[in-house]
């Protein structure tokens, strides 16, 4: 068994993470850790995420984006009030939000209305052109790949046709590989340890920064 001192020595450069360390770093149950350890480990290795700080950042960001490694497909189960940011951004009108958003008496927004929201807010963006592209290429994977252009680019990186088979990104192996591809190719490792900059690359802003910071701190405590 590796001693604490040995782990610290190895953590200065490349080092392997075992399942117990991954579970603690990601803050997962034993069941989720068993499910995700192999896909995440293989994906990080494939795309050169080997530095302990980068591993901690990747696990933290993937954990936030996927609600703790549980959500692989973007949800549009929005309350009416939850659509306000889309209104401000000019992607929905107030009338559309009132017509499509979840009402107090509804537990879950019907899929037809979720689809309508996605097709409106992602229309003519990120390569989406056809009427149903917003829903078809909604966010999938541990780090939500979104939009036809990103699906195409990611598919090229993974050597699989994600334009024709977008649902593959909801499978664990591709969910992890797509996240590692994004993290590596979008320049996240150029800002090793810079939570703010990496969050902007992944999110386009700083949404959920406190949760990302908490996750990163926990992961660093275990891995670095």
Language model regions located:
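N-terminal secretory targeting signals
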Residues: 1-17
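Low-complexity, Gly/Ser/Thr/Pro-rich intrinsically disordered linker/tail segments
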Residues: 2, 10, 201-224
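Peptidoglycan-targeting cell-wall enzymes and recognition modules
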Residues: 12-35, 39, 63-178
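Amphipathic alpha-helical segments that form the core helices of the histone-fold
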Residues: 37-48, 58-63, 200-203
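Short, mixed-charge amphipathic alpha-helical segments
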Residues: 45-50, 164-167
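Surface-exposed patches in mature extracellular/periplasmic domains of secreted proteins
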Residues: 48-58, 71-75, 189-199
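Acidic helix/loop microenvironments that form the catalytic cleft of cell-wall polysaccharide enzymes
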Residues: 62-66, 147, 193-208
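Proteins synthesized as precursors that undergo proteolytic processing into mature forms
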Residues: 174-176, 185-189
